[in-house]
Swiss-Prot record:
Pathway: Secondary metabolite biosynthesis; terpenoid biosynthesis. Involved in the biosynthesis of phenolic monoterpenes natural products thymol and carvacrol which have a broad range of biological activities acting as antimicrobial compounds, insecticides, antioxidants and pharmaceutical agents. Catalyzes the C2-hydroxylation of gamma-terpinene to produce carvacrol. Also mediates the C6-hydroxylation of (4S)-limonene and (4R)-limonene to form carveol. PROSITE patterns: CYTOCHROME_P450 (PS00086). Its EC number is 1.14.14.-, 1.14.14.51, 1.14.14.53. Induction: Induced by drought. Accumulates upon root colonization by Myrmica ants (Myrmica sabuleti and Myrmica scabrinodis) concomitantly with jasmonates induction; this leads to the production of carvacrol, an attractant for the phytophagous-predaceous butterfly Maculinea arion, whose larvae initially feed on Origanum vulgare flowerheads before switching to parasitize Myrmica ant colonies for their main period of growth. Strongly induced by Spodoptera littoralis, a herbivory insect, thus triggering the production of carvacrol, which exhibits insecticide properties. The keyword Heme applies. It comes from Origanum vulgare. This is Cytochrome P450 71D180. Keywords: Heme, Iron, Membrane, Metal-binding, Monooxygenase, Oxidoreductase, Signal-anchor, Transmembrane, Transmembrane helix. The chain crosses the membrane at residues 1-21.
Amino acid sequence: MDISISWVVIIVFVLSYLILMDKWRASKLPGNLPPSPPKLPVIGHLHLLRGGLPQHVLRGITQKYGAVAHLQLGEVHSVVLSSAESTKQAMKVLDPTFADRFDSIGSQIMWYNNDDMIFSRYNDHWRQIRKICVSELLSPRNVRSFGFIRQDEMARLIRVFESSEGAAINASEEISKMSCAIVCRAAFGSVLKDQGKLADLVKEALSMASGFELADLYPSSWLLNLLCVNKYRLQRMRGRLDNILDGFLEEHKVKKSGEFGGEDIVDVLYRMQKDTEMKAPITNNGIKGFIFDVFSAGTETSATTIQWALSELMKNPEKMVKAQAEVREKLKGKTNPDVADVQELKYLHSVVKETLRLHPPFPLIPRLCKEECEVTGYTIPAKTRTLVNVWSIGRDPAYWKDPDTFNPDRFDEVSRDVIGNDFELIPFGAGRRVCPGLHFGLANVEVPLAQLLYHFDYKLPSAMTAADMDMSETPGLSGPRKNPLIMIPTIHNPTS
């Protein structure tokens, strides 16, 4: 009995302390915060995130409380931006203020203590690695130089589809293999024996790192950090990742050059590592972190976008017919089409843009407001975690007619690009932290998609109709399909 009373006293004391701390923190906040839903003591608005994917739940909140909404998630104060206007102000007008990232357990473990580029803080290291990326690694010129790799891997994929003619094929799995092979050969100069294991690890990491860990939301609690089960799972994954990447890098050192005779991405990183004039020297972990960036941002996102594009075209047969007609007319007689050839495919570009609007590769873009500022009339305190809901902006009826409908033809009337200039459509982000690999990513989406539309017609398995297709998403940084895309390919006969 005494023990029970003691526990009650302890629990009451702890809760009282947490409530008082919560009120003390609230008293330090400015008065002109963005609108906010009613919150609970201690947990704040955490209970509102139940029952759906984060981008869906946050859209519901901003639809009710305004395009700029303030949330308290545990101890952490966050702001959600769900309009083109507020996002433009944060990512363009106030870009240096919002160019930072906030730390999380997932990024610190899997991305080498954020010693990469995607999750790096806004500092000299980030500026340096981004400059290398833009000028040396993923420039438009280098993207074109990887053309033969795309052609080679597309030929492999086409052979797989041909061998499955008339039978159901797991298109998601085969497209992911192709995307992984392209990135692996561009990074390491050759196909590597464990690249399949790395691809599986990327999927697992993206799924786990996309969640809201309690230890991240209560950073002052050593107990929650100690009890965080996912932290230990991520640490085991990090060990597997180290083994794979260390093996890749050792294998890379013994070969003389990439398969195209020049430098691959790892060659460039090693060369830069030896440069004694660099402000922030590149470490071995920095090289591994950047390689994991390339795989996580370049493999899964490209593959996911192709899968969503094919899914939407299968669900909208009239759009499929139009896309195939254009591809087959413009690419007729071209044996190995690449980036220059697909530039002529206006409708294909619209299909890709519409796919990225509905299924952005990064539904939520994280930023950190490093100093107090004002966005659309509201005060954003310093060190506020900021989430840009790209998924919600792409489905906002204020910018898009029939926003939930897949309609590539809308871009005949509305001229918007996907490279960060038009804030109604920012699948790759915008401002200083716009994705530096967007040209590489677009090439690895448009070229394979064009060839898949050129060479094959498609049916759904058994008695399934377009209306039966499951278009659900599953949790993950890249917004992947919940279920794999299963299709029946038929070789297109131009004379039939």
